[in-house]
Amino acid sequence: MASIEVMKERARIAGRFNLSARRNPEHRALVTLAAQRAGGECHVIPVAPSEDEADVLDRARKVAGGSPVIIVTEADGELYARLFNSESN
């Protein structure tokens, strides 16, 4: 299980992405695409800067259950979002 600090950082990044998906057309389009492919709602996997990439991908596969998810990272104050499909990546 992740530390409290990592969980807080994930929550902060998820909150920022939630707001950004309402305002930023690129993020909104990514959420729409993921939801369409998943047949409804999509999952967002926020990634804290200190997290290991292998752990993040493992967590995404568990959450995805074969559906696409959005992996969100933050670098230099900017959000970066990427669609991840556990069947093809």
Identify the residue ranges that each predicted region occupies:
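An N-terminal amphipathic alpha-helical segment
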Residues: 1-43
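Polar/charged alpha-helical tracts
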Residues: 1-12, 25, 54-62, 75-78, ...
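Generic serine detector
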Residues: 3, 20, 50, 67, ...
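Weak global preference for isoleucine
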Residues: 4, 13, 45, 70-72, ...
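Compositionally biased, intrinsically disordered low-complexity segments
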Residues: 7-9, 16, 48-50, 66, ...
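Short, hydrophobic/π-rich interface segment
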Residues: 36-68
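C-terminal edge-of-domain segments
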Residues: 67-89
